Amino acid sequence: MYLSEIQNKDIVNLKDGKKIGNIVDIEIDNNGTIHSLIIQKNKFNIFKSSDIEIKWNQIKKIGEDVILVDNNI
């Protein structure tokens, strides 16, 4: 899987159905396995960094337009 394949998908929290944010980076381990997604929660606030980490095991479904995650944000 390439970052470009998932980068433009909406990240949606299964807990409340709300969009969390956009993928800005991924963390990969030494074996090349994706460890987590780095999500920019509030991209319009230039004064406050609000990146969050979504662990790969929190991802429940990757669809055509949406990635569903189980996260307590």
Task: Kindly give the residue locations of the regions a language model identified.
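Peripheral interaction segments used for macromolecular assembly
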Residues: 1-73
